[in-house]
Amino acid sequence: MAQAIDASKNSPSDPRNREVVFPAYRDPQIGDLETPINSSPLVKWFIGNLPAYRPGITTFRRGLEVGMAHGYWIFGPFAKLGPLRNTVNANLAGLLSALGLIIILTGALTLYANSKPPKPVKSVATPNPPEAFQSSEGWNNFASAFLIGGIGGAVVAYFLTSNLELIQSLFGG
């Protein structure tokens, strides 16, 4: 058994002996690695289509999309897993909690924007970081749009959850 293992370690044709992790762009000075995950076309496509990295959209729209998604999904855990989960006011408590967290997150984004953040670094997965994240003004625009989108996303989730029976009756469910 040990002899077979030693034989496979020394065989260049064995696929387990192939290198799969390389320095980014084959330059070890960059300090990033290309792995089969972060350099695959599927992952690059997925990350490139996220609102933060999608080319051709404004800073305000980036913040609005990210805020709407966060407001929408933050509502659920507060409403359905919070301490008031089995009460009549569970959805309202979830909405208010989600709004509070969105406001805290917006404050954190604003603080970051005012701290003179460094310019984004080009990486394997994001070879072209957007211009929006290269200035304090861009980050402030992103933060204000995040607040609007976050509030909107949480309110939409609240109305959908609170009126679930009505929505189901409209669609025959």
Swiss-Prot record:
It is a multi-pass membrane protein. InterPro entries: PSI_PsaL (IPR003757), PSI_PsaL_sf (IPR036592), PSI_suXI (IPR022980). The keyword Cell membrane does not apply. It is found in: Cellular thylakoid membrane. Coiled coil: none annotated. The chain crosses the membrane at residues 92-112, 142-162. The keyword Ribosomal protein does not apply. Keywords: Membrane, Photosynthesis, Photosystem I, Thylakoid, Transmembrane, Transmembrane helix. GO terms for biological process: photosynthesis. This is Photosystem I reaction center subunit XI. It comes from Mastigocladus laminosus (Fischerella sp.). The gene is psaL.
